[in-house]
């Protein structure tokens, strides 16, 4: 079975083809980073227009990469939410139209389920059950996962997501968009311990997060200590250490409360090397395992949508003739497969 996956939830156009026997056959990705850089963030209208320009050419490129034609595709999966409504509508409209034209099923996919299942694309995929840390620009959630669609929300950010806090703090440090990866690079040159940031909400029970205060703390630290290059690097290091430690502490609590031995990390921030190293060290001490996708599958991509679409199709999920997207869509609302 071959599934074409279409991802257009934000500022990446991702197209991929997944075969349930051979694995990933094609993966095409176009990033709009340069388009939005001058604005310091994603401009929804510009994102939608660029998806219109890029989606069909990338589908053609994916078919060529895989050596396939339209007649070889058994289903079309597309991101139906959450995300930017205009961007979602582009991918959903193209996906639904192609499915109708090719006389194959259309499969709406939850963007965050795509991220959650991305580690399944690797040679050593995790087995159920596990605790999932979904950490990106729009979400920071801890989820108990006992099967496909069997998701229990354990905790989430009550304000900024971790990735959003990275980007906002990077902007305070004078870094360009997207700031998260640039902040991490700057942090690698920083001196540990010169500045100490709080670890929000770790001094109380529970698994929720709060990162907006770290941005304010960073702004005050920058204002009080000047902005020479080394000081900025030291502040970046302190900020990253605070976020990573907070995520690690909450993951440890989630593992203790569930009794699970496996931790899955997914989403754009899961590509952070410091976070990966700290969680790997923690899980080794706990005699458990940590799983994550390769870096190119941590950020938005079509491969995770194609894979999640295949899983959902085998569970009997298909779309009707309408084109429906959900900019807000709780993961817990998905049915079990």
Swiss-Prot record:
Record flagged with keyword Iron: yes
Q: Its Enzyme Commission number? A: 2.3.1.234
Q: Which UniProt keywords apply?
A: Acyltransferase, Cytoplasm, Iron, Metal-binding, Transferase, tRNA processing
Subcellular location field: Cytoplasm
The entry's substrate-binding residues are 134-138, 167, 180, 272
Secretion signal span: none
State the GO CC annotations. cytoplasm
> Major location, coarse class?
cytoplasm
GO molecular function term, any single one: N(6)-L-threonylcarbamoyladenine synthase activity
Q: Which cofactor does it need?
A: Fe(2+)
> Which residues participate in Fe cation binding?
111, 115, 300
Q: Which InterPro entries match?
A: ATPase_NBD (IPR043129), Gcp-like_dom (IPR000905), KAE1/TsaD (IPR017861), Peptidase_M22_CS (IPR017860), TsaD (IPR022450)
> What is the catalytic activity of this protein?
L-threonylcarbamoyladenylate + adenosine(37) in tRNA = N(6)-L-threonylcarbamoyladenosine(37) in tRNA + AMP + H(+)
According to the record, cofactor stoichiometry and binding are noted as: Binds 1 Fe(2+) ion per subunit.
- Please cite one Gene Ontology biological process associated with this protein: tRNA threonylcarbamoyladenosine modification
Say which domain of life the source belongs to.
Bacteria
- Which family would the database say this protein is a member of? Belongs to the KAE1 / TsaD family.
> What does the UniProt record say this protein does?
Required for the formation of a threonylcarbamoyl group on adenosine at position 37 (t(6)A37) in tRNAs that read codons beginning with adenine. Is involved in the transfer of the threonylcarbamoyl moiety of threonylcarbamoyl-AMP (TC-AMP) to the N6 group of A37, together with TsaE and TsaB. TsaD likely plays a direct catalytic role in this reaction.
Recorded protein name is tRNA N6-adenosine threonylcarbamoyltransferase
Q: Which organism is it from?
A: Salmonella typhimurium (strain LT2 / SGSC1412 / ATCC 700720)
Q: What is the lineage of its organism?
A: Bacteria, Pseudomonadati, Pseudomonadota, Gammaproteobacteria, Enterobacterales
Gene encoding it?
A: tsaD
């Amino acid at each position: 079975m071959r599934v074409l996956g279409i991802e257009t939830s934000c500022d990446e156009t991702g197209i991929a083809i997944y075969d349930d026997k051979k694995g990933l056959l094609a993966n095409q990705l176009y990033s709009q980073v340069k388009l939005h850089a001058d604005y310091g963030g994603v401009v929804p209208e510009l994102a939608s227009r660029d998806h219109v320009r890029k989606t069909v050419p990338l589908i053609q490129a994916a078919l060529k990469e895989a050596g396939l034609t339209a007649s070889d595709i058994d289903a079309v999966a597309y991101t139906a939410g959450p995300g930017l409504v205009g961007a979602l509508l582009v991918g959903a409209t193209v996906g639904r139209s192609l499915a109708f034209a090719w006389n194959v099923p259309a499969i709406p996919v939850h963007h965050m389920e795509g991220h959650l299942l991305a580690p399944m694309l690797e040679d050593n995929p995790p087995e159920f059950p596990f605790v999932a840390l979904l950490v990106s620009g729009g979400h920071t959630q801890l989820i108990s996962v006992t099967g496909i669609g069997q998701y229990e929300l354990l905790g989430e950010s009550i304000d900024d997501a971790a990735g959003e806090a990275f980007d906002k703090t990077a902007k305070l440090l004078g870094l360009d968009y997207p700031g998260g990866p640039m902040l991490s690079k700057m942090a690698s040159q920083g001196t540990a311990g010169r500045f100490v940031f709080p670890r929000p909400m770790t001094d109380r029970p529970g698994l929720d997060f709060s990162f907006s205060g770290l941005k304010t703390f960073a702004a005050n630290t920058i204002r009080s200590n000047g902005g020479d290059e080394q000081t900025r690097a030291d502040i970046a290091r302190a900020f990253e250490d605070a976020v990573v430690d907070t995520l690690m502490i909450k993951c440890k609590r989630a593992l203790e409360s569930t009794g699970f031995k496996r931790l899955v990390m997914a989403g754009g921030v899961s590509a952070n090397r410091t976070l990966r190293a700290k969680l790997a060290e923690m899980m080794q001490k706990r005699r458990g395992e940590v799983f994550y996708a390769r870096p190119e599958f941590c950020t938005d991509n079509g491969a995770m949508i194609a894979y999640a679409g295949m899983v959902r199709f085998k569970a009997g999920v298909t779309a009707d003739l309408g084109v429906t997207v959900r900019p807000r869509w709780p993961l817990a609302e998905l049915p079990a497969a």
